[in-house]
Amino acid sequence: MAERVLTRVHSLRERLDETLVANRNEIVALLSRIIGKGKGICRNHQLIAEVEAIPEATRKKLLDGAFGEVLRSAQEAIVLPPWVALAVRPRPGVWEYIRVNVHALVVEELRVPEYLHFKEELVDGSTNGNFVLELDFDPFNASFPRPTLSKSIGNGVEFLNRHLSAKLFHDKESMHPLLEFLRVHCYKGKNMMLNDRIQNVNALQYVLRKAEEYLTTIAPETPYVKFEHKFQEIGLVRGWGDTAEGVLEMIQLLLVLLEAPVPCTLEKFLGKSLWLNVVIMSPHGYFAQDNVGYPDTGGQVVYILDQVRALESEMLLRIKQQGLDITPRILIVTRLLPDAVGTTCGQRLERVYGSEHADILRVPFRTEKGIVRQWISRFEVWPYLETYTEDVGVELIKELQGKPDLIIGNYSDGNIVASLLAHKFGVTQCTHAHALEKTKYPESDIYWKKMDEKYHFSSQFTADLIAMNHTDFIITSTFQEIAGSKDTVGQYESHTAFTLPGLYRVVHELCIDPKFNIVSPGADMSIYFPYTEKEKRLTSFHPEIEELLYSPVENEEHLCVLKDRNKPIIFTMARLDRVKNITGLVEWYGKNTRLRELVNLVVVAGNLEKESKDNEEKAEMTKMHGLIETYKLNGQFRWISSQMNRVRNGELYRYIADTKGGLCAGPAIYEAFGLTVVESMTCGLPTFATCKGGPAEIIVHGKSGFHIDPYHGEQAAQLLVDFFEKTKADPSHWAKISLGGLQRIHEKYTWKIYSERLLTLTGVTAFWKHVSNLDRLESRRYIEMFYALKYRKLAESVPLAVE
């Protein structure tokens, strides 16, 4: 047998050198085309377009070998003639950086700081050799376990539980931290589960065995109150269960854990921990339950209200199952707006509909001049948040009669406030970005100075950076948000390395860290349910829906008319901004003659009644009017103002599904999750949605819906044409996709699954914080310094609102 020889793996530069020698002319021709366009950033889809414009024979040579691998996996090219630098992503979370001198055909490998420095030269006022602040969080995480298998990404707490269990629990004495964790569980000064009689692990095991023996002798349904006194005498108090059966299950779970600490048993036991005071931060925008129609009051408000009801339901169930008679409290903390404009936003405390113990607590923004009365865009809240945090802290203590157990941040402003509050109170923090604006607005980091007057991204990106690194765990709705896919960069992954020229460079913000956990939400199934459930249908809304869609009248609620109501409908409903790309969908439709022959287009977005206060929405409305005129859309197109009645919106989806021919489209340039995608699928309406972000994961292409590429409008329009032509020829095709969507939702996207998982994550995280160095004190000191020396100045530089 021939001897096996180990060979060295060649670096990317070495492999490229070989390809450059073999295909010199073809590579020079391509790179010359790219630098011929002048300095700038060339995105992945633009690079691919340049390659596709080359004759096929030449293209095949280019794409074979190392250079082809680089082109396919390059996410951007920085063009500064004669140099082209490439950020290459061979797989999720792995990045390499090179630059090529097109004239000399020299290839150099770059470290992250070198690549970012080169990129900064695109911008006037580059560093010119001056010292630049570089942020690197990697040294703080060097000894911390990191997931390497893709299946562990997004299951961070589960991964951490496995790792730390193996490290910490090796004998009976090492179980003492678990005993201590149980002993600190109390409610209003009263112990839960254990009293002071139990002082060590041996005593705990002895007591649990005695309890187990007794419980096996009585009826499973025996209420806890019947044996409460007997348990108190041996050191056990309320919190184990409401019946003998429930108590026995918990006690046996703990006995198994003490005997042989297995991670899944530990997670199951800790998952039953009780968290009684939960605070959910959402400072910006109008946050109310009725009549909120501003650009910042979209999916996040709906998400939080549904989240709160699901969490309360799960918390009450757990409290009952554990035999406790205590009251949980959930507070949604947001702005109080004296100028409430017909809403309840000026009311300090408001009970959440359908809940017993959840309230909206409103605290105003204030300055030295007094309370800020008017609504402020989410991009302009930064100078108010530090004072706001102090005021919120006082209100929480007053309202809860103590500290919260868990603080959940939402969006950038809610996450920075949650970080400050969690730091102040020393409690568990969870963050949820919903959307990271750096991902939504390409090149908003490198060209931040151009955008800062309008968007103040320097403050926002810095707040995001602080919150991500301070929080105990991060929840995302999809894997895509964390690490993307083979072809798409993850929302968080894009924050690993970036630069804000003149401010700082981030050379290693965060890795694919165990703090990331996928916890997908669902739609409110009392509102969004399948069109086939006839007995639940809200037919009383049908006359109003009929008028919205088909009335020949144009007014302040709807513009343009549908002349042929027998055609199926492409339906879309979203905020009217550039990222949601509603005008992009309208343009695709306007340009495709066959699509216009087959179907009508109905758009629900923006406010036709009054002028928007949001600059981006104003620009999109102007663009929409231009498209209607350019493509003569009246007769095939209907533009309806944003609809705030969620209950009627659910019936609107079902009404369109009744035709067994329509569909819902989500054409966003980027969608962090895609709640409207889940809502439409839950109603049984086939859904086409962007392949950029969460919908790429929610939808299984061709089975439960279809992906569309917002950067290739012609292809997206053709995909729609193909679907409608196939459905016209075979109506069962529509039914098959509708059913596939419903099955996908019930498997993965419900609020019941969400609330169970979130509370389990909280329990496991709190335990490991208590018994290990999970709070990462060293990095928090680094963050404190960065907050005080950099973020505070940026936030103070944002102009205060003019009232």
From Swiss-Prot:
One of its GO terms (molecular function) is sucrose synthase activity. Disulfide bonds: none annotated. It catalyses: an NDP-alpha-D-glucose + D-fructose = a ribonucleoside 5'-diphosphate + sucrose + H(+). Its EC number is 2.4.1.13. Gene3D superfamilies: 1.20.120.1230, 3.10.450.330, Glycogen Phosphorylase B (3.40.50.2000). Belongs to the glycosyltransferase 1 family. Plant sucrose synthase subfamily. This is Sucrose synthase. The lineage of its organism: Eukaryota, Viridiplantae, Streptophyta, Embryophyta, Tracheophyta.
